[in-house]
Structures are given as C-alpha cells and as structure tokens.
C-alpha cells in the first residue's frame, strides 16, 4: 500500500474528465483532440467528428469493450501469470462516447445476463454495475490512460429554472461525477463554443483544477488540434500545484 507523507513530491497522474452538452456542440470532436485517443463509440457517430481518432472501437454490448483485444488479459509467460494489455496500451487517452450507453445499457444488460435475479433487484444490480465499472476504470488508470466520458445534456425543471446535467440515470451519474476530476458543460455563447467547469445553480459541474470558462478554438486551427490535450495538461498541473501548496 503506497504511503504519501506531507512533504513527499506528488507526480502527475492520469485524469478523468466528463464532457456533456447538447447535440452539435462538438463533444466528440473536442475529445479526440486529446493525446493519442482511442474512441469507444457506442453511438455509431465517430464519422461525424471533424477528425478521426487513432483507434475506434465500435461497441454494441459490454463484451465489445471489456475483452482481451481492447482491454487486455492475463497470460502465462515463462511459467508466470502476467497482464498483457490490449489496444489501450497503444493510446494515451480513452474516450467513451457515450457514458450512458455503456453504463445504463451495456453494463446493465451484462449484469442481468450474469445473474437473472438482478433483473428484479435494482439495488443489487447497480452495485454489480458499479463494481464492474470501477474495475474497468482501474485497468485504464493502471495503463496511465487519461479518460474522457462524453454525455448528452439532460434538462430538468427545478422550479422556474432549467438545470443541465450529464444524461445518465441517477446512480450512474453519481458514480461518474464522483470519480471525475473535471465535469464540463459545453454550450454556445455569442456563436462561440465554450466549456464551463464551475458548478452553478443551473448546471452540474466539477472544477478540481479551478479552470476558467474555456473557449473552444475554431476547427482547422492549430489551437483546436491540441485543445483537449492542452486542457488535460492544465488539469494535471493544477492538481500537482494544489498538492504542493498543501505540503507547505
């Protein structure tokens, strides 16, 4: 068990970012400007992005994602059991588009497939789904992969106000927000696209790195080509700086 003391130097670690917004705001296109992205496409929409990721995994069930070819598996080498990573080892960023399909559809169906009794016991089913999801994220983290989860925008009426949040069922959404370092809402202002990380009364957000509203550059510019990679760099640097400040 690693132990970190107050004066120890904390190094950069992989981060988890949730991006959500309405259709047409370029969520997938933005996510694939991260470093060396592998896109897990559950919406069959990778061809709508303005550029193609390094690798695209088209998925219609959990087994299309969690398998030896994509994730990896244990193999025996020289009489020892060792972990052999799959396609994830070729990329630095894993993009899941969308998180709702993976969690609410694929993982839900897989859990019931493994134990039919879970079909009538939602509490236990969500517990199993949560453990499978944590295992998936844990493998990606051990691969030093940054992770981006893409969600659609869900609007809910709260009194006279409309609140925006990632479109997932309650428990899945809670799980995503809990493990995320940043949760950003993509919208348009004055014809420009912007990511807002700071939580407000009218939107869900998470801003561990204290990032300001971030304008998304126009397609085809050098700034856009590395936009998500640059955001991830800022998040990692901010987390390390916060940790260093706490040690003083």
Short names for language-model regions:
Residues 9, 29-31, 85-86, 139-140, ...:
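A general structural signal for short secondary-structure junctions and capping/turn motifs
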Residues 154-248:
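Conserved GTP-binding G-domain of TRAFAC-class P-loop NTPases and closely related GTPase folds
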Residues 1-11, 15-21, 29, 224-248:
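Glycine- and charge-rich intrinsically disordered segments
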Residues 68-72, 105, 150, 179, ...:
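Conserved, well-folded catalytic cores of nucleic-acid-processing
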Residues 37-39, 147, 183-185:
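Short, well-ordered beta-strand core segments
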Residues 93, 99-175:
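P-loop NTPase motor core
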Residues 34, 52, 142, 177-178:
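Short, well-ordered coil/turn elements that cap or connect secondary structure elements
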Residues 2-96, 100-105:
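Conserved P-loop
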């Amino acid at each position: 068990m690693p132990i970190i003391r107050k004066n120890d130097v904390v190094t950069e670690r992989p981060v988890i970012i949730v991006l959500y917004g309405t259709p047409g705001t370029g969520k997938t296109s933005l996510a694939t400007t991260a470093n060396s992205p592998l896109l897990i496409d559950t919406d069959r929409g990778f061809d709508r992005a303005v550029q193609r990721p390094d690798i695209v995994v088209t998925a219609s069930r959990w087994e299309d994602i969690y398998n030896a070819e994509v994730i990896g598996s244990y193999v025996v080498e020289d009489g020892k059991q060792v972990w052999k990573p799959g396609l994830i080892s070729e990329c630095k960023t894993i993009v899941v588009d969308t998180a709702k399909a993976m969690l609410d559809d694929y993982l839900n169906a897989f859990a019931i497939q493994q134990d039919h009794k879970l079909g009538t016991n939602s509490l236990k089913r969500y517990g199993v789904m949560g453990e499978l999801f944590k295992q998936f994220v844990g493998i990606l983290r051990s691969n030093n992969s940054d992770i981006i989860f893409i969600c659609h925008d869900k609007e809910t009426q709260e009194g006279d106000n409309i609140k925006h949040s990632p479109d997932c069922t309650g428990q899945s959404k809670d799980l995503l927000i809990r493990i995320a370092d940043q949760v950003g809402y993509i919208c348009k202002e004055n014809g420009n696209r912007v990511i807002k990380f700071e939580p407000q009364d009218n939107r869900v957000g998470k801003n561990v790195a204290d990032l300001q509203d971030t304008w998304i550059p126009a397609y085809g510019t050098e700034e856009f080509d590395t936009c998500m990679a640059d955001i991830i760099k800022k998040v990692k640097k901010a987390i390390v700086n916060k940790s260093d400040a706490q040690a003083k």
